[in-house]
């Protein structure tokens, strides 16, 4: 049995998903709400969890966290709305809005084969629209650029948070544990048009820093594939994770996968080793590198995107300093320029085999 901050009982409905830290359920008597319940071992470590949830809840009341889609506005993530306590009064989780009809980006990133993509969700009413929108080919490719573009706008907003009245909020938020599983995308009909609408999840993991205080999880979650070489510190760490995600959405390949080390880097094939040694296939060491024959066409598609976007990827994965990685603002401009370039034929742009 669980309770809200003012003592109302919460009954858990069906499970919506789970991650490394928690399970998320539908609220049994209010399906518009989702309930995140942390695992005991996480609660033991996260002594300031209640404080962070409270702070995020307050922030959600005052900050402009909406994006326009057609004539509607969507909240850009699942923000904590209330804490959840167990019967002895310990904080064990929080309540947020349910994201309906969303698919996590891990499925979109890997959606290459129409016979297996989204198969787990074959009976979901959205199955065919996900196939239609996100399959890694022709039309799906353009939508993956669109998705990356929206995400760059979303995160730009997060890093330059403003109040609803437009005043800047003096607060840095970073270390989102950005990875496909922490982002959902749904196709929503808004006044007669279908829009791809992303949602950022797992917001409890982030760090909030103002001039006086820093509020962060005692053991921030991270995921190796999205972890920048320097580890989670600031927004530049997130810029790395986001660039990996954009690369995966666009090229259906992790930037450091299927890269071979040639002579100079022959002592390691681990992805981590390549990341640390600046072995991005299009970076400074490219003359020492090759890409695996099976997958080379995927990295090879890099040459088909605009040089503006190529440079953003190179800066993201091959800069000397984390602060040289492109900002979300630069990504959104680069992606929009490419999307608006009428001479780009997205359905014929890439090789898929
Ligand atoms: N508001 C929500 N609406 C719908 N599904 C959600 C929501 N929040 C989380 N989920 C699902 O639950 C999974 C785990 O949630 P998450 O907050 O990422 O937990 P963890 O901190 O353990 O990673 C997500 O990957 C997603 O599939
Ligand atoms: Mg998660």
Locate predicted features.
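Terminal C-lobe "cap" of eukaryotic-type protein kinase domains
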Residues: 317-344
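Activation of the activation-loop gatekeeper triad in protein kinase-fold domains
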Residues: 201-207
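Catalytic-loop of the protein kinase fold
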Residues: 147-148, 155-195
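Conserved C-lobe activation region of Hanks-type protein kinase-like domains
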Residues: 246-307
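Conserved activation segment of eukaryotic-like protein kinases, specifically the C-terminal portion
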Residues: 213-233
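Conserved structural core of kinase catalytic domains
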Residues: 75-145
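ATP-binding glycine-rich phosphate-binding loop
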Residues: 1-41, 72-79, 86-88
């Amino acid at each position: 049995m669980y309770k809200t901050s003012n003592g109302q009982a919460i009954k858990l409905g069906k499970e919506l998903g789970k991650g490394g830290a928690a399970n998320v359920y539908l609220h049994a008597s209010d399906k518009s709400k989702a309930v995140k319940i942390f695992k005991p071992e996480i609660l033991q470590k996260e002594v300031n969890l209640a404080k962070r949830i409270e702070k995020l809840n307050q922030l959600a009341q005052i900050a402009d966290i909406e994006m326009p889609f057609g004539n509607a506005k969507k909240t850009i993530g699942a923000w904590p709305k209330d804490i959840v306590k167990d019967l002895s009064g310990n904080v064990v989780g929080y309540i947020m809005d349910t994201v309906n009809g969303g698919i996590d980006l891990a499925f979109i990133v890997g959606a290459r084969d129409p016979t297996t993509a989204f198969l787990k969700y074959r009976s979901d009413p959205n199955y065919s629209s996900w196939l239609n929108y996100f399959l890694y080919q022709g039309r799906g490719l353009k939508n993956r650029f669109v998705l990356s573009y929206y995400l760059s706008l979303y995160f730009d907003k997060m890093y330059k948070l403003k109040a609803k009245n437009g005043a800047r909020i003096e607060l840095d938020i970073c270390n989102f544990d950005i990875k496909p599983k922490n982002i959902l995308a749904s196709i929503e009909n808004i006044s007669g048009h279908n829009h791809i609408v992303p949602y950022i999840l797992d917001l409890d993991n982030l760090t909030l820093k103002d001039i006086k205080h820093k509020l962060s999880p005692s053991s921030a979650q991270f995921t190796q594939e999205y972890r920048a070489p320097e580890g989670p510190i600031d927004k530049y760490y997130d810029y790395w994770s986001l660039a990996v995600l954009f690369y995966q959405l666009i090229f259906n390949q992790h930037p450091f996968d299927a890269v071979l080390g040639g002579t100079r880097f022959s002592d390691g094939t681990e992805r981590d080793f390549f990341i640390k040694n600046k072995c991005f296939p299009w970076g400074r060491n490219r003359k020492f590198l090759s890409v695996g024959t099976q997958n080379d066409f995927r990295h090879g598609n890099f040459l088909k995107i605009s040089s503006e976007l190529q440079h953003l990827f190179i800066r993201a994965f091959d800069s000397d300093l984390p602060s040289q990685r492109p900002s979300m603002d630069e990504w959104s401009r680069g992606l929009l320029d490419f999307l608006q370039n009428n001479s780009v034929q997205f359905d014929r742009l890439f090789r898929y085999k």
